[in-house]
């Protein structure tokens, strides 16, 4: 009985981490094969696991089990070294919906919600975590134009993200 209660508690504690923020809708007609590859972090809301990092990238590739290998990499200026974190991601619902769960510390998963995406060329995306304290602007290159930056920032602000706190990442 105790083991069952602990199992239920663990499910309840970890299930909240794969939710979708209010008013945020994952993209549909998502094609994983087009999303795979290297993405540059253009901007993010601050979190301890990325604090102080520049030149941040994420590489996505297929895993043998059908999931996605996630390799995040960033440079710590204060430590003068590269930092990497490898994780795995799986679709939460249908594979044509930009809604995945990602883990860097199994068995714990967090949401990866793609809610804005260049549907033709997959050149930029807006991604959130389980709540609105997580936000990333990603692109295929290390920079995006000012107009696109403004459009993406305004879209996130309209949905309730605190875009005044965005950290714009340098890639030099």
PLM features per residue range, with description:
Residues 5-14:
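Sec-dependent N-terminal signal peptides
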């Amino acid at each position: 009985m105790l083991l069952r209660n602990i199992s239920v508690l663990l499910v309840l504690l970890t299930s909240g981490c794969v939710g979708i923020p209010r008013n945020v809708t994952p993209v549909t007609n998502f094609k994983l094969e087009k999303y795979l590859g290297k993405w540059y972090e253009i901007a993010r809301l601050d979190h301890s696991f990325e604090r102080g990092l520049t030149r941040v990238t994420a590489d996505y590739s297929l895993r043998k089990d059908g999931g996605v290998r996630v390799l995040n990499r960033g440079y710590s200026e204060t430590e003068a070294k590269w930092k990497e974190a490898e994780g795995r991601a799986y679709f939460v619902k249908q594979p044509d919906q930009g809604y995945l769960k990602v883990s860097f510390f199994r068995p714990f998963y967090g949401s990866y919600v793609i809610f804005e995406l260049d549907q033709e060329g997959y050149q930029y995306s807006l991604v959130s975590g389980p709540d609105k304290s997580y936000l990333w602007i990603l692109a295929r290159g290390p920079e995006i134009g000012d107009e696109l930056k403004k459009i993406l920032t305004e879209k996130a602000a309209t949905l309730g993200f605190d875009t005044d706190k965005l950290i714009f990442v340098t890639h030099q």
